[in-house]
Design a protein with these regions (language model features):
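Conserved catalytic/switch belt of AAA+ P-loop NTPases
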Residues: 46-50, 117, 121-160
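Walker A/P-loop
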Residues: 2-13, 47-85, 100-103, 132-137
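A short hydrophobic beta-strand->loop->alpha-helix junction that borders the nucleotide-binding pocket
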Residues: 61-62, 83-91, 146-147, 167
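C-terminal helical "lid" of AAA+/P-loop NTPase domains
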Residues: 195-201, 207-221
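Conserved AAA+ ATPase "SRH/arginine-finger" region at the nucleotide-binding site
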Residues: 86-88, 163-176
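Short glycine-rich substrate-engagement loop in P-loop NTPases that contacts/grips substrate
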Residues: 38-43, 80-114, 125
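Helix-loop-helix "sensor" segment of P-loop NTPases
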Residues: 176-195
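A short, basic N-terminal segment
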Residues: 1-51
C-alpha cells in the first residue's frame, strides 16, 4: 500500500488532535453510513470489495457522501498495492511514475495496483489521457472521485472504461448515526433535539455534521450542550 496512506484514515500521527471526521472515518463496509443502493448487502460493489475483485470505477456525488471513505475501505481489504493521488496536487509526471512503478511491481511480484485519484475532474484532458493506456491495458485499476458530473468532466474514453457509482446526500437517520459515532469518540451525549439540529444543518454531508458537532462540543467547554 502507498506509504502513510492511512495516517489520515485512522487519525494519523495527530491522534486525538486530528479532526473528528478523520478520527471516526469508517474502516470497513459494516461501519459505512448510507448509500445502500450502491454498497448495500448483496450489491455488485459490496461483493466486488469483499472478494477483492474491484474494477475501474468513479464515485460521483456531493461532499461528505463517502467517496474517499469507500476508496480507503477498498485499500484496507485489497491485496493489491494501493496508491492515492489528489488531482489538485499532481500532474502527468506523477501519473507516469505510478504507471511505471505499477509495471515494475507487476513484473517482479505479480502484485496489481489500484490508483485512487481524488478530484479527478481537476485533471485536464492531457492529464486524463496520460492515465488511459494504463487503465485500458489493466495495468492499473482506477478509482476516481469527483463532485462534478463525470459526463462533462471526465474524458469519454476514460469514462467508458469505468463503472460509475452516484452517491447521494445522507438521509436524516444515517446522519444521526454518524453524529452518534462522533459523540462516542468525544465522550459526550447530545440531547435528541440538539442532534436533530446538527443533522438538519449538515445538509446530507457527514463531514459537515461531524465538524458542527466538534465545534459545538469545543464551544461548550466541557459543559452539557443545550
Amino acid at each position: 500500500m502507498a506509504n502513510d496512506l492511512f495516517a489520515d484514515a485512522a487519525g494519523g500521527r495527530l491522534g486525538a488532535q486530528a479532526p473528528l471526521p478523520q478520527r471516526v472515518r469508517p474502516q470497513a463496509l459494516d461501519e459505512f453510513a448510507g448509500q445502500r443502493d450502491v454498497i448495500g448487502e448483496g450489491s455488485a460493489l459490496q461483493r466486488a470489495i469483499a472478494e477483492d475483485r474491484v474494477g475501474s470505477m468513479i464515485f460521483y456525488g456531493p461532499p461528505g457522501t463517502g467517496k474517499t471513505t469507500l476508496a480507503r475501505i477498498v485499500a484496507h481489504t485489497t491485496r493489491a498495492h494501493f496508491e492515492e493521488l489528489s488531482a489538485v496536487q499532481v500532474g502527468i509526471a506523477d501519473v507516469r511514475r505510478v504507471l511505471s512503478e505499477s509495471e515494475q511491481r507487476l513484473g517482479q511480484t505479480g502484485q496489481k495496483t489500484i490508483l485512487f485519484l481524488d478530484e479527478i475532474h481537476r485533471f485536464n484532458k492531457a492529464q486524463q489521457d496520460a492515465l488511459l493506456p494504463g487503465v485500458e491495458s489493466g495495468l492499473v485499476t482506477l478509482i476516481g472521485a469527483t463532485t462534478e458530473n463525470p459526463y462533462f468532466e471526465v474524458n469519454s474514453a476514460l469514462l467508458s472504461r469505468c463503472q460509475l457509482f452516484e452517491l447521494q446526500p445522507l438521509d436524516r437517520d444515517d446522519l444521526a448515526g454518524v453524529v452518534r459515532r462522533g459523540e462516542t469518540e468525544l465522550a459526550t451525549t447530545l440531547p435528541d433535539e440538539i442532534r436533530d439540529e446538527i443533522v438538519a444543518a449538515a445538509g446530507g454531508d457527514a463531514r459537515n455534521a461531524l465538524n458542527i458537532l466538534e465545534a459545538a462540543v469545543a464551544a461548550a467547554g466541557g459543559e452539557p450542550i443545550s
